[in-house]
């Protein structure tokens, strides 16, 4: 082993070189202590804006100050108000000279930080909002520090790291190697990518090159689903298919949101062989109901359709032996959406999309500018999603998966499900409230025992938020206004669940009129 000290401009680099027999040596830079003297020469500093030069000379101190603010926030997130309902500050004019990073940090801490929600905390049960595990926060910080543009592989290992992470996630969700994947911003874009590939598949079946001729060349497209998320209709609008092309298929009776497979079969028969898109749901928003994926996939023996599965958070059922049966058949899908800033508990924004037809995906998203090059057998990520440029979103997920493994993330899922059942049992026992759907996984859907109007339900949600103890989101289920409490945060405990229940119980006479 050879240790040498080299200089890169004014910054020393300690390099450890390991001899590996006849192979080329492997060199790994070990960052030394930041130099006490400013790294910029006088000429360099003279050419740089004053505040930039000052921040560069004090970079370690600035990062330490930011670290201290973050550490205080994370240490107190359990007790800070879960939601802030007061008015935000008025806008200020754009600075001309700038204050420097330290002053900006102070201004943020004084002016804006107090009004940010406690959405990273354990009692933020609105929407389906995960927190950020300690390892994923560290990975997210380093994502910014290394500042990689992961869309292209040239000159960096960043794309290889993402491919490794996608492979781990594929294994985590029980998908076979036929599925390739890429990171995107969230479930909406993941669904959009999956449906874009489905649109290209329709063209393949109908003899139309959609990527060249446009969606209009397909004619009317049939999209069938039982209880789709609103992001599906948004995706259909973006893709030029049209929101109104989504055809609702009846669901099972008995307080269910899962599609009736017999009704789906009948709807496909009515198409007389015309290819279609079927959107199956692995975890509906209100009750976390699951379509019978295996039975839906079996319909492909008789009908021509692309099977897209929205498994934004329900896909995490695969992590638990107790609940994995709910996603049986997921591997048979042609494309799959999974959101990672929900139940994987990595910082916003992160999701992954999978598909069996990377060739069609590349046809849709390839960017063939001469300086970018043409797609290859293992195309760069800029050829797979709408983004040509993006950060290394995979790194926080890589950190969390490596730090806690599949067993650590399984524990989060199983604990959250147990806590959802605990809250559901408590709500069922509270006067004035009524459990409105069975607790199937991690969401509790409930409403008022009397007069569950939209106004009264919204008043309950606001009253709970005003206590600072919890945050819930209103919804409508089976035609009735209701509330949802979604458990997906790694921090949430029985004590947190009991505090949410106490906040509900503290409302006057159960509820405002």
Which residues are covered by each model-predicted region?
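Conserved PLP-binding catalytic core of the aspartate aminotransferase-like
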Residues: 434-464
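PLP-dependent enzyme catalytic core of the Aspartate aminotransferase-like
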Residues: 44, 303, 477-513
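Conserved PLP cofactor-binding pocket of PLP-dependent enzymes
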Residues: 438, 443, 467-484
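Short loop-beta-helix segment that forms the pyridoxal 5′-phosphate
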Residues: 169-196, 247-250
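Active-site C-terminal subdomain of aminotransferase-like
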Residues: 328-431
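N-terminal entrance/gating region of PLP-dependent enzymes' catalytic architecture
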Residues: 45-178, 499, 503-504
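Conserved PLP-enzyme active-site core in the AAT-like
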Residues: 190, 196-362
């Amino acid at each position: 082993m050879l240790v040498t000290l080299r200089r890169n401009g004014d910054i020393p680099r300690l390099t450890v070189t390991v001899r590996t027999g006849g192979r080329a040596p492997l060199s790994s830079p070990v960052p030394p202590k930041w130099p006490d003297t400013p790294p910029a020469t006088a000429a360099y500093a003279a050419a740089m804006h004053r505040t930039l030069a000052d921040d560069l000379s004090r970079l370690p101190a600035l990062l330490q100050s930011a670290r201290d603010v973050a550490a205080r926030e994370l240490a107190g997130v359990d007790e800070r108000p879960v939601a802030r309902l007061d008015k935000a500050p008025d806008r200020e004019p754009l600075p001309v000279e700038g204050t420097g990073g330290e002053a900006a940090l102070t201004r943020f801490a004084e002016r804006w930080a107090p009004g940010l929600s406690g959405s990273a905390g354990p009692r933020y049960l609105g929407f389906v909002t995960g927190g950020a595990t300690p390892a994923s926060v560290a990975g997210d910080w380093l994502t910014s520090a290394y500042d990689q543009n992961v869309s292209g592989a040239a000159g960096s290992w960043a794309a290889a790291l993402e491919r490794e992470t996608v492979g781990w996630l594929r294994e985590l969700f029980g998908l076979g190697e036929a599925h390739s994947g890429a990171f995107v911003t969230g479930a909406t874009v993941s669904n959009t990518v999956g449906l874009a590939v489905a649109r290209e598949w329709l063209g393949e079946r109908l003899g139309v090159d959609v990527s060249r001729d446009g969606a209009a060349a397909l004619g009317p497209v049939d999209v069938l689903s039982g209880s789709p998320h609103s992001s599906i209709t948004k995706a259909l609008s973006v893709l030029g298919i049209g929101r109104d092309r989504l055809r609702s298929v009846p669901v099972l009776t008995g307080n269910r949101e899962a599609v009736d497979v017999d009704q789906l079969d009948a709807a496909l028969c009515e198409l007389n062989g015309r290819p279609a898109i079927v959107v199956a749901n692995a975890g509906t928003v209100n009750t976390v109901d699951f379509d019978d994926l295996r039975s839906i996939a079996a319909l492909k023996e008789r009908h021509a359709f692309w099977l897209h599965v929205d498994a934004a958070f329900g896909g995490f059922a695969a992590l638990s032996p107790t609940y994995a049966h709910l996603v049986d058949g997921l591997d048979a899908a042609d494309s799959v959406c999974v959101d990672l800033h929900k139940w994987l508990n990595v910082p916003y924004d992160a999701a992954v999309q999978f598909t069996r037809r990377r060739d069609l995906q590349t046809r849709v998203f390839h960017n063939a500018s001469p300086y970018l090059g043409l797609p290859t057998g293992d195309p760069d990520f800029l050829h797979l999603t709408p983004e040509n440029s993006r950060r290394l979103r995979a790194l926080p997920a890589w950190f969390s998966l490596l730090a806690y493994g599949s067993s650590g993330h399984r524990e989060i899922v199983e604990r959250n499900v147990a806590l959802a059942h605990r809250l559901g049992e408590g709500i069922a026992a509270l006067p004035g409230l009524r459990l409105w759907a069975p607790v199937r996984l991690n969401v509790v859907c409930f409403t008022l025992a009397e007069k569950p109007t939209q106004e009264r339900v919204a008043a309950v949600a606001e009253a709970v938020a005003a206590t600072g103890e919890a945050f819930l989101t209103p919804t409508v289920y089976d035609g009735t206004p209701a509330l949802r409490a979604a458990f997906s945060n790694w921090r949430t405990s029985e004590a947190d669940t009991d505090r949410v229940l106490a906040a509900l119980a503290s409302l006057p006479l159960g509820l405002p009129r």
